Amino acid sequence: MKTLLLTLVVVTIVCLDLGYTTKCYVTPDVKSETCPDGENICYTKSWCEVFCTSRGKRIDLGRAATCPKVKPGVDIKCCSTDNCNPFTPWKRH
């Protein structure tokens, strides 16, 4: 009986989501934040604007419930593990 009870407790703990939430980097501060319930996708969105050749692409880091749809000319990468959307600033020469 004790073995059955212990097995049930272990299965319950493994199957339950014990309040775990994903963390994503978010702009403009580029700091890691805990995602609210239902938002488990981190993304990095990038695109060119007027000053793209001299300043590089614009970058937007965030979180969402699903990977956002983007317009042509906008690149997006989505992921679902903690802090999987880091931003590495490019070096100016």
Swiss-Prot record:
Pfam family, one: Toxin_cobra-type
Key word Transmembrane helix present: no
Designated name of the protein: Long neurotoxin LNTX22
Tissue: Expressed by the venom gland.
GO cellular component: extracellular region
Keywords of the record: Acetylcholine receptor inhibiting toxin, Disulfide bond, Ion channel impairing toxin, Neurotoxin, Postsynaptic neurotoxin, Secreted, Signal, Toxin
GO molecular function per UniProt: acetylcholine receptor inhibitor activity; ion channel regulator activity; toxin activity
Region forming the signal peptide: 1-21
Function text: Binds with high affinity to muscular (alpha-1/CHRNA1) and neuronal (alpha-7/CHRNA7) nicotinic acetylcholine receptor (nAChR) and inhibits acetylcholine from binding to the receptor, thereby impairing neuromuscular and neuronal transmission.
Stated family: Belongs to the three-finger toxin family. Long-chain subfamily. Type II alpha-neurotoxin sub-subfamily.
Subcellular locations according to the entry: Secreted
Cystines in this chain: 24-42, 48-52, 67-78, 79-84
Main location: secreted
